[in-house]
Amino acid sequence: MKYILPVLLFPMKRILLFLLLLGIFKASIAQISSDSLEYRIRPDSLKTGELQLSFQNFNFMRNYEYFNKIQDGYTLFGTQLEPQLVYFAHPRLVITTGLHLQKDFGATGIYRTLPLVSLKYKNGNTTLINGVLEGNIHHRMAEPLFDFEKRITEPVEYGTQFMIENKSLFLDAFINWKRMIYKPSPVQEQILGGLSVDYKLIKNSSVQLSIPLQLTAFHQGGQIDIAPEPLQTLVNTAIGFKLKIPLSGFVNSLRTENYLMGFNDFSFTDVQAFSKGHGWYLNTGFDTHFGSLMGTYWKGMSFISSNGMPLYQGVSQHIEHAGFTEKNRKLLMLRYSYQKQLIPNLFLDFRFEPFMDMGRPAGNRKIEFSNSSFLVYRQSFKLLKPRVDR
């Protein structure tokens, strides 16, 4: 299809290697900003030799009042705790080790416990990470490609990540090894490669303009499994532009973020309902001291995303309607968000996102919505100072 962005037809492992070697773009923040939810630990030449205790507590409530056939209605309510030991081994190297724990309210015991181990090397504007990635929301991908909810449901990603960060350029290229297998495995391995890019063309006091480029490549297969399912290789792409106009007064800024998205199934065997598709993801809104308001329009045609929010897709993940297809999706959303630092190290993030399915007959259209609140506390404590040789 002429609207689909071209994707190199390399074997999957070459695609993933290609993502790591790319170094010419920058990641983008799509739709609602999640800056207050990001947490990055990096090497620091002023802390060389120090041992710190890093503490992050992420409290979440995300509720979906959905009554459609594509995405379920449900509530995620709980807390995550991540204590980590952070050793600044060298001006360019930091090593971290710790635990991720998740407690879901209303459930018995700890829902999930995962190890956190990472090595981060930073040289100038480039960073190489191995182990636990700066994942999910840190990739800054648009929701149709990468579901925001994965901050809760898949909070820890393991693999390798390469980043470039400067005033006009930020690149996030990563391999997330989702499932490892051992011979003979009853299930297939799963790998997700990604590239999230945003190149700033103009940035001054009167206007900011940038070009985002995003790509995910999901592979499920392997050569040492005995699973009967055929291998799958699904690729999603996005390209667009972001424009922000700073203002003074009640409205701080006007902004628009718009994307053309593509889907291609490069599997040898047809498993998905559609082999290719595309979608338009259009966002326009404004920011004030009392929060941000944004209108969103989505038009998807045969669109599937391996990691995106189910609502935007043409194939249902609903518990009662799994496999139901809706080739053409038209959604109209109004999205309010409010982020604030309450006290040092404590951040609040609130979101209210009603939408209407414009693909339904006029008399059957209903307003559905999701609402979210996040309370995040993060702090670092010095445990060991660097030894000074006399």
What do these predicted ranges mean?
Residues 55-63, 99-105, 123, 132-137, ...:
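Transmembrane beta-strands of outer-membrane beta-barrel pores
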Residues 127-198:
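Surface-exposed coil loops of outer-membrane beta-barrel proteins
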Residues 139-144, 270-275, 285, 289-355:
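Outer membrane beta-barrel transmembrane domains
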Residues 51-57, 97, 128-130, 162, ...:
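Membrane-embedded beta-strand positions of outer-membrane beta-barrel proteins
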